[in-house]
């Protein structure tokens, strides 16, 4: 795995709560196919092989949404739980998810569920506490309906009637899903990977968002900035991530002094004021502005 995604841990973290798990595996030469052999003989896991069409889906990371839809359309259950390969579900979330899916199965108002996020940063101890740099909640469970699609770069989902199968960033004629927020944590490891892999991952990822992107060259590892300026996560971590976290081996490539992390939405004056209001005045998880691609329902 050239980009150090916790694929195996991600899948294993949700297997106990699903009837079937579909892995959409694109064409690659980085050892992913070999890695996925760990699931040979696992009756719940089905792998769909695909070829990424980056000519058609050539902007804004829409190839991620298209690939997500491949998996979504292959699902057969009432509810579809979605997890990206850099996300790991907390074990305490599983009974919460199971109960909610049963409770709201026949309540057609509810089209999806939001999960709460912990975005780890730099190593496995620090996290991003800015609600505007990293989404604090997102849709990760949706009803299995043909008009519900992955949206934009697959961060979220949307109702898109008569979808043309190409324009995953369309807004006109679409609408947000009606969702309930669950007290269930999902951990994002996208910003807490080996800095040597992070350079390669950033180049590949950014190229999928812009055809004009010029890759960074001559850099051996990614600089996360001064991790001492980021808060420590004090809660428990997903059991499925225990082995990976115990193998942490890039302490020599991160620092705890010097210039701060390059997170404009955490350190800019505007966002520091907004963060203060949200955390110390509102104190209920609400955000001022920001990306909210859902209609929140009361349980």
Give names to the regions the model predicted.
Residues 7-12, 33, 77, 91-102:
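Short alpha-helix within the catalytic core of nucleotide-sugar-dependent glycosyltransferases
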Residues 25:
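Short beta-strand/turn micro-motifs composed of small residues
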Residues 84-88:
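The conserved acidic donor/metal-binding loop of glycosyltransferases
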Residues 61-65, 69, 91-299:
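Catalytic-site signature of metal-activated, phosphate-bearing donor transferases
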Residues 4-9, 29-79:
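Active-site-proximal specificity loops/subdomain of glycosyltransferases
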Residues 20-22, 46:
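A structural signal for isolated positions on well-ordered beta-strands in alpha/beta enzyme cores
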Residues 1-20:
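Short, well-formed alpha-helical segments that are part of the catalytic scaffolds
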């Amino acid at each position: 795995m050239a980009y150090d995604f916790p694929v195996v841990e991600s899948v294993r973290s949700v297997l106990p709560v699903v009837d079937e798990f579909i892995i959409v595996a694109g064409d690659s030469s980085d050892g992913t196919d070999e890695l996925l052999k760990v699931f040979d003989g696992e009756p719940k896991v089905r792998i769909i092989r695909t070829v990424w069409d980056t000519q058609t889906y050539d902007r804004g990371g829409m190839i991620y949404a298209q690939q997500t839809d491949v998996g979504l359309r292959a699902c057969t259950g009432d509810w579809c739980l979605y997890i990206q390969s850099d996300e790991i579900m907390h074990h305490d979330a599983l009974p919460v998810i199971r109960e909610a899916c049963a409770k709201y199965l026949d309540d057609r108002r509810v089209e999806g569920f939001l999960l709460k996020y912990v975005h780890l940063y730099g190593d496995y101890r620090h996290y991003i506490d800015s609600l505007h740099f990293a989404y604090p909640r997102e849709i990760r469970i949706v009803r299995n309906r043909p008009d519900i699609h992955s949206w934009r770069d697959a961060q979220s989902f949307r109702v898109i009637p008569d979808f043309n199968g190409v324009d995953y960033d369309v807004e006109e004629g679409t609408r947000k899903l009606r969702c309930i927020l669950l007290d269930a944590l999902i951990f994002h490891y996208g910003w807490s990977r080996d800095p040597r892999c992070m350079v390669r991952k950033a180049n590949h990822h950014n190229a999928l968002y812009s055809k004009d992107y010029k890759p960074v060259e001559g850099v051996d590892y990614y600089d996360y900035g001064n991790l001492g300026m980021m808060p420590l996560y004090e809660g428990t971590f997903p059991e499925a991530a225990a082995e990976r976290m115990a193998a942490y081996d890039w302490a020599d490539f991160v620092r705890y002094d010097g210039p701060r992390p390059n997170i404009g939405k955490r350190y800019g004056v505007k966002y520091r004021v907004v963060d203060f209001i949200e955390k110390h005045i509102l104190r209920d998880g609400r955000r001022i502005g920001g990306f909210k691609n859902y209609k929140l329902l009361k349980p």
